[in-house]
Amino acid sequence: MTEQKLTELLRDMSLEEKVNQMSQVTGGFFNGEIVVTGPMADKGFTEDNVNLAGSVIGSMGAETLKSIQKNYMEKHPHHIPLLFMLDVINGYKTVFPIPLAQGASFEPELSEQCASVAAKEASVSGLHVTFAPMTDLVRDARWGRVMESTGEDPYLNSLFCTAMVRGFQGNSLKDNYAIAACVKHFAGYGAPTAGRDYNTVELSEHTFREFYLPSYQAGIDAGAALVMTSFNTVNGIPATGNKKLMRDILREQMKFDGVLISDWAAIEEIIYHGYCADREEAAARAVDAGVDIDMMTGIYSENLCQMVRDGKIREELIDEACLRILRLKNKLGLFENPYKDADQKKEQEYILCEEHRKLAREAAKKSFVLLKNEEHILPLEQQKKIAFIGPYVDNRNLFGAWSFIADAKDVMTLHEAVQEQYVSENSTFCQGSPMLGADVCLEGFGEQQQQSYTKEQEEHMLQEAVQAAKEADIVVLAIGEDRLQSGEATSNANIRIPEVQEALLDRIAEVNQNIVVVLFSGRPLDIREINKKAKAILQVWLPGTEGARAIADTLFGKYNPSGKLPMSFPYCVGQVPVHYNEYSTGRPHVEGKDKDRFRSKYLDIPNEPLYPFGYGLSYTTFEVSDIHLDRTWMDTSGQIEAEVTVKNTGNCTGTETLQLYIHDIAASVVRPVRELKDFKKVTLRPGEEKKVVFTITEQQLLFLTENGIYESEAGEFEIFIGKDSSTDNKASFVLKK
């Protein structure tokens, strides 16, 4: 449909029809099958405005959605199709590693492939829009939704956001198997005070623009069709009613011209923030800020028409919002084919097909981070007597909290994966402990997880595990967070594994010191005790449908881990939020070298995290040479090539990710101690070496000045090239102007 036809359609629509295009309801209003992702309350919907609603959240399945679409369009005066939306975060039925784990791959193109597969499965099930990617910058591991981000670095986040948008949307939204991406949560949702979900966000203008906005901008530049508002206040004003944030910054400065949708009930919640007195005022604030779709409150549908008639808001605001929604439907080709890709036969053909599972296995392997490997205890030797112990040994729930479409029956356990590929009569398998303590109950999206073991059963599990550990050469301890301990509304002040699992670790360590920990989590954890007791730690996150096979491949050396941390693992929760790209202080502290008390440091713990951003080991070892610069100065139109030689000094083929960091030594605005500017992956055979060249241009030296624009300044810069953000391999050059 042409723009002229869309404008004519808009002109023919009644005010009620336009307003209700701006309302979103669940499929439960149509067929009783519903998945909820927010607090349920009296939403104020009537049968009339539901029958005119513009979009549906929380329903899926080709047959179901085609039926809803058909019945809806028959009743609609202008036969305008519905949009079907769902949180397809890291996969549909084929689940990939959580986004934080995908960030550990340092391979955005792999995430693009994963998003493309997720879009294919979702689209044949009738969906048009996913509420992904979440590109919020995260620094606080107490916040449960760090699992949905790709980490603490704005450059890395931007690359992954771009890749995921491209993967979901393809070359055109009208293409087969393309769905519209929604960048979220705008803005600053990843910086809640005290790491408590939905909490206040206080960010300086400089920090907000330089660290938090770039990844949103990357998604917009990649063509994301939607942006979602965040629940939180930003410097005292709720984002969903923040006209400066949504109109001045998002639409005017960042050039976003797509659909802006609220998060679940977020328009209503600006009343609870104390920003509005009632639902009518909330509707006025949100529509004035440019929020096009009200997700699940009924505030728009029950208030806007009368407010227009009373002259309290301009109808032009309704028209511009409705037109953006119609444009999105048109871009998806729904006016020509309202069912788009929905197809039951293709659901059976594509969902969980072998090709998709193969990609899920590859993505899982590349997300694993080897944190520790003393005495080269990994990879495992099959002839050894190995005891696999822990609540994750026979657990099929290897996907993140948002994977409510996935089915655990489609997932292989670690026990099954080991027996399938590396069967050995010397291996034993036992649970050892419950996942959680007996008094812990977790509620997820329509599901609960509560332990039902008696004290006697727990003691029996523990004794069985201790005996198995005594008789084993090596213990593989599969432990970590439950999948429902991370995600939305899962803030934790204690970011350690559950106490019952810590007790299991303690008892096993008493009888066998050859412990390999396979660590599952949706966030960085405080793993000091694990680090003391384990000889090896393999961080596997929440790895998805093919996670168990990927873990088995890695443990037994079929795959050599190469992942790098996208988020620092704190020494303890007292450091949080901790991140590598902090500003220097006037009294900087050098760990292990500076004994002066009057420095910026803790008295009881180190300043540095236990494992820093960019860190990750391999089964082999790599040696990185000193940095060679082809010149020691450049002007704004020039470039410098920084070269290192990396050599595989170990006994097996492996992949290293070399990382380039830059530090502006003296600037008009204090710069971070280092910032990631580029990275390159290199795969080498034993003894092989390769020259790796990074090109430095003025673009990498730009920063946000006091003038509010990005500029470079003449002066000296340090560059660091190494295997993680703590590398001391450096050189320097001068920018002349």
Q: Which residues does each PLM region occupy?
A:
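Glycoside hydrolase catalytic-domain context in secreted enzymes
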Residues: 1-705, 711-725, 736-737
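Edge beta-strands of extracellular beta-sandwich domains
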Residues: 729-733
